[in-house]
């Protein structure tokens, strides 16, 4: 994710012999934003150049499904989160989450509130019945991370800093693919 492994940084903090050093590139930050925006724009143009309509009279379709996923207690003080061999995941009440989709021709836009990890996004694109599937997170609100099973098994940050329990991402993937299959007909 760009917030965890950015291509470039305008402001950064490093430690030298235990002392925190803050570097602020100030005005250069605007150049970084412009460069990243241009890169994003070029990628969008490349993708849109590949989108075709098989039938000229296709209709825009909207779909939505709501379902429950396992919940878990979440540490509110992020400074308390740190690597550990076996973090304690305390189950909480199941959470309602939503998958929304807009489909036209061979293009599907899939929107979810949680921040999905790359594995979930790639799986959704790979198994989608649509040739082009764009996965959008934090749609109609945000809901923190929704990590895959291995993130829980390997004590990754996304699992520790999540209101969702182990298995939630896999349920969301199945529900999203089911919605797309239903919309594809």
Descriptions of predicted regions:
Residues 1-185:
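Non-catalytic substrate/cofactor recognition surfaces at enzyme active-site rims
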